Amino acid sequence: MPTKIQIVFYSSYGHIYKMAEAIAAGAREVGDVEVTLLQVPELMPEEVQVKSGIKGYRAAFGSIPYATPEVLAEADAIIFGTPTRFGNMCSQMRNFLDQTGGLWMSGGLIGKVGSVFTSTASQHGGQETTITSFHTTLLHHGMVIVGVPYSEPGLTNMTEISGGTPYGASTLAGADGSRQPSENELQIARFQGKHVATIAKRLANNK
């Protein structure tokens, strides 16, 4: 039976979606895994989406199905992606996680691997606090937290401004959202996907 990896994300302008695709590519490098991308529902009123331009950007990944709390229980590992909002996860992701009380009651996520990636507008925009505060919810669910070890050389790349932390992959979008994930950031994301899948497979095989 394949090890099941879910990548559950929210993306406004596509940066987190691009990182999610890179993470999925890395996870698929591990043999006998099944990788599924899922997004969480939008909360923003449609008129605000149109005015801000988000609606157009989100159309690029509109075909990706929405996650439900029940579906999470089917995974061996879940990698969550969220943009930063004032050093925390976005409201869309928080709203989704607040619906997982039933899973908490049943212990449905205990022992599953949990991991997080993020994006910020600026270099010091709260990447690390977003990921580590997200970990609190995963730990309440009894998940096994996995980050990005320093065996990934992109974490110590000093030749460019780049996201990427030992807590999880990250990217910088710029104040206007014009900066796209760099190759270094995408490589860290691919590493995270492969690393999580490897550990999840090992744990699943030892059940």
UniProtKB/Swiss-Prot annotation:
Cited InterPro entries: Flavodoxin/NO_synth, Flavoprotein-like_sf, Flavoprotein_WrbA-like, FMN_Rdtase-like_dom, NQO
GO BP, one annotated term: generation of precursor metabolites and energy
Biological classification of the source: Bacteria, Pseudomonadati, Pseudomonadota, Gammaproteobacteria, Pseudomonadales
Co-factor(s): FMN
Example of a GO cellular component annotation carried by this entry: membrane
Annotated NADP(+) binding sites: Y13
Organism domain of life: Bacteria
Chain sites annotated for binding FMN: 11-16, 84-86, 119-125, 140
UniProt keyword Flavoprotein, yes or no: yes
Enzyme Commission designation: 1.6.5.6
Name listed for the protein in its UniProt record: p-benzoquinone reductase
Function: Involved in the degradation of para-nitrophenol (PNP). Catalyzes the reduction of p-benzoquinone to hydroquinone.
